[in-house]
């Protein structure tokens, strides 16, 4: 190869090495984002729950509940920086055959989040149950590269963010996950009018404070930020004017089903694979290939520099050259003879 071939290989190898460095530092952060077309349904179950039967205005115990949460991305409302989710949650009484009566609670939510940090952002007509509301903190996912620290996590029922504290690292569904816990201390979330008899009052209608408390535990795959398992110990009660709990609206320990955990684990593995491709596999391949090209190029350049052409032979001159004294062939030398008449005759012969 010519020297220029080696130089081209060195340049190409250098370019690949630069690409190997830039991919995890520049390219990956630009591509690793929360997807706009998010679509998932998670199912949680609770055993032996207590709920308020609004038909009979009495508590029912030993009830099995199922909660369905559907998350759908509003692609048109999202962009490079934000994703918008529409969320619906419905809790039903498994034992109630009448579909219209089996519903225990229902809620809707619309939230916009930063596609890189997963933090809520003020945008896009966000609301809770149709009423405009500004979210804060994390909502339905954790950030890529979740750390062992405390995050602010939004509670839709309390309508504020609470500290979700890192507790431990565990194994779940074949994944290493971070366990976070957050506590919603008892808080009044509304006031409603109810029959006085419900609160033990003789009045026909009374005001009742609706109170809420929750202990939420989340198991998060740290690379992807996917919540592999969620669990809530939720309590809602009605209180009378003295602040005493009179009746339970819901008292349940809801947790992701095994199937939902497997579904979430698969989503985490898929996301982690894409992240690993951009942050590890591609940089390593580019770096090694670039290094090989540089080494080959340097070798070719050095070899070409050492193999300079020999000096061209000088063409023989057409004219004969005189022999050096040492090279002359010995020839017989004739001794000069003295002219007749001796020396004087010789002298006379000169003009």
Regions found by a protein language model. Give the residues of each.
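Cytosolic juxtamembrane regulatory segments of multi-pass membrane proteins
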Residues: 48-55, 319-332
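Membrane-proximal extracellular "stem/stalk" segments
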Residues: 198-280
């Amino acid at each position: 190869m010519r020297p220029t071939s080696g130089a081209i290989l060195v340049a190409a190898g250098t370019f690949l090495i630069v690409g190997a460095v830039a991919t995890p530092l520049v390219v990956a952060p630009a591509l690793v984002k929360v997807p706009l077309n998010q679509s998932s349904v998670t199912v949680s179950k609770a055993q032996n729950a207590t709920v308020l039967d609004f038909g009979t205005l009495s508590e029912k115990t030993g009830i099995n509940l199922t909660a369905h949460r559907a998350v759908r991305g509003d692609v048109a409302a999202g962009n490079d920086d934000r994703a918008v989710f529409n969320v619906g949650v419905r809790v039903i009484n498994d034992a109630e055959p009448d579909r219209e009566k089996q519903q225990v609670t229902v809620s809707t939510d619309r939230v916009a989040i930063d596609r890189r940090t997963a933090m809520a952002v003020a945008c896009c007509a966000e609301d809770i149950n149709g009423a405009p509301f500004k979210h804060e903190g994390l909502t339905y996912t954790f950030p890529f590269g979740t750390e062992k620290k405390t995050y602010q996590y939004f509670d839709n029922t309390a309508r504020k963010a609470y500290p979700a504290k890192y507790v431990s690292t565990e194994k779940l569904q074949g994944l290493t996950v971070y366990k976070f816990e957050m506590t919603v201390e008892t808080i009044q979330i509304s006031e409603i009018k109810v029959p006085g008899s419900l609160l033990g009052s003789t009045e026909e209608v009374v005001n009742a404070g609706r109170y809420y408390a929750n202990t939420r535990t989340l198991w998060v795959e740290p690379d992807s930020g996917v919540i592999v398992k969620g669990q809530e110990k939720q309590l809602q009660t009605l209180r009378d004017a003295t602040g005493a709990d009179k009746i339970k609206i819901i008292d349940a320990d809801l947790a992701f089903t095994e199937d939902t955990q497997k579904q979430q684990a698969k989503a985490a593995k898929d996301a982690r694979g894409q992240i690993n491709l951009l942050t590890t596999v591609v940089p390593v391949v580019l770096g090694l290939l670039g290094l090989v090209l540089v080494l080959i190029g340097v070798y070719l350049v050095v070899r070409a520099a050492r193999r300079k052409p020999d000096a061209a032979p000088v063409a023989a001159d057409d004219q004969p050259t005189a022999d050096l004294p040492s090279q002359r062939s010995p020839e017989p030398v004739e001794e000069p003879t003295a002219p007749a008449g001796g020396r004087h005759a010789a002298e006379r012969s000169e003009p």
